[in-house]
């Protein structure tokens, strides 16, 4: 008779998904329109266009750029269009919003691009602890994507998972 310890977690057949795998290493930078406003509040078309013409756009090469205005100013839509047209040759992408909003968007895009076929009829645990903070939006989106295909969905670690969803027997 063998008294060797048995790893019941390893034998459970659970599949663990770590939301941190969707964190990117892309460069995300902000472009604040406030820096191009007269007195930090007013957009003067001629001055703005000249600033856009003389700005060094190569600094954004390969980056994902979040175009926003940190001042409480009214920015005409064409100003965002002009910035986008200047960023297009260099930047990987541009987005209207803050850098944090852009990081969230990129994170969600990766979740939505995930091949859910590998989780079909599996018992899945979505890892809850990690080195990187993961927002609730990620857990919501992972649940939305996986629920239609998994046998069961849990949160936490394999040794102490919280049940979230279980497919009803047909």
Where in this protein do the model-derived segments appear?
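Short acidic, glycine/serine/threonine-rich loops at helix termini
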Residues: 106, 137-139, 165-169
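Short glycine-rich or small-residue beta-strand-to-loop segments that form or flank ligand, phosphate
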Residues: 64-70, 95-97, 123-129
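Extended, charge-rich low-complexity interaction segments
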Residues: 116-140
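N-terminal, charge-rich interaction modules
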Residues: 1-75, 84, 91, 149-152, ...
